[in-house]
Amino acid sequence: MMSSRLVGTALCRQLSHVPVPQYLPALRPTADTASSLLHGCSAAAPAQRAGLWPPSWFSPPRHASTLSAPAQDGGKEKAAGTAGKVPPGEDGGAEKEAVVSYWAVPPSKVSKEDGSEWRWTCFRPWETYQADLSIDLHKHHVPTTILDKLALRTVKALRWPTDIFFQRRYACRAMMLETVAAVPGMVGGVLLHLKSLRRFEHSGGWIRALLEEAENERMHLMTFMEVAQPRWYERALVLAVQGVFFNAYFLGYLLSPKFAHRVVGYLEEEAIHSYTEFLKDIDSGAIQDCPAPAIALDYWRLPQGSTLRDVVTVVRADEAHHRDVNHFASDVHYQDLELKTTPAPLGYH
């Protein structure tokens, strides 16, 4: 302890005899320098040119915006994150730079085959298709096992309150149906995705197939939203039903994927029946056959002049495809196989 004190005392004595550099007095704050520091005046400019104030080790790096750079450089540089020009607005304003993003990622411009602008951002032209109307609408999987019978009775039990609530308001009924039908594909796709990551294995294309099914059902909902505007209590019902059904199906898929897919297969059979009744009411005049929404014309590549009846027809064909896919997936599990061993029907809406 004493030796440390002696060494410290000797070091202090040596430092006390070190001559002070001549430029240090220039660092003492005066009235002028204090004023320049407080008000941003140019009084410190001579000291800066002389290299005396501030020293390089004291001055922090400058983190200023680059937006003012064009004014200083005569407008030679453009601000980062801008691309393209915006045409003058309706108020006669001048052209403005279109701010894309901080990362300067420009949005892609998509056009139709005829060169007109593509109006939708929720889907692209290469995601559109023509529905296969030749599919058999009368297929029915006859339940043979206890799980099959339980799945069928579960779907029948879900249909009973729907019939009471909506009766023959099939536009609103279809809207409610699609909010439920879009859940299983997403749940199954997510669980298979996590399984693929967890086991370091491929899925056989089933992740994409189920997510495509969920997206297709969501597009059904977006279409019928243009036809039937839901009331506030119907929106509240959607929240309740979706919250319960999502968690129930999630748990059911974890416990038994073959049961979960069988439930969806029977649910799609009921959807086919509902859309068939929808078409009967359109043909009888009970429901007005209004023009098809624009989103339906582009998504299903329907010809101009198509009506609501054409939309319901292609949606019913989609449901028939979903019926076949889910019954097929359930059959794969019943044979004690995994979905990854059987190629998925990609693009099979």
From Swiss-Prot:
Q: Where is this region: Disordered?
A: 63-93
Q: What induces it?
A: By salicylic acid.
Q: Which UniProt keywords apply?
A: Disulfide bond, Electron transport, Iron, Membrane, Metal-binding, Mitochondrion, Mitochondrion inner membrane, Oxidoreductase, Respiratory chain, Transit peptide, Transmembrane, Transmembrane helix, Transport
**How is this protein's activity kept under control?**
Not sensitive to pyruvate. Is in a constitutively active state. When the two monomeric subunits are covalently linked by a S-S bond, the enzyme is essentially inactive.
Cofactor(s) for this UniProt protein: Fe cation
UniProt xrefs under InterPro entries: AOX, AOX_sf
Provide the reaction this enzyme catalyses: 2 a ubiquinol + O2 = 2 a ubiquinone + 2 H2O
Q: Which GO terms describe its cellular component?
A: mitochondrial inner membrane
A single BP term in Gene Ontology: alternative respiration
- State where Fe cation 1 binds: 178, 217, 220, 319
Cofactor comment: Binds 2 iron ions per subunit.
Compartments it resides in: Mitochondrion inner membrane
- EC number(s) recorded for this UniProt protein: 1.10.3.11
Q: In this entry, which stretches build a coiled coil?
A: none
Transmembrane stretches, start-end: 174-194, 236-256
- Miscellaneous field: The 3 alternative oxidase proteins detected in S.guttatum, with apparent MW of 35 kDa, 36 kDa and 37 kDa, may be post-translationally modified products of the same AOX1 gene.
Q: Which family does it belong to?
A: Belongs to the alternative oxidase family.
**What's this protein's function?**
Catalyzes the cyanide-resistant oxidation of ubiquinol and the reduction of molecular oxygen to water, but does not translocate protons and consequently is not linked to oxidative phosphorylation. May increase respiration when the cytochrome respiratory pathway is restricted, or in response to low temperatures. In S.guttatum the alternative respiratory pathway is thermogenic.
The protein here is known as Ubiquinol oxidase 1, mitochondrial
Which organism's genome codes for this protein? Sauromatum venosum
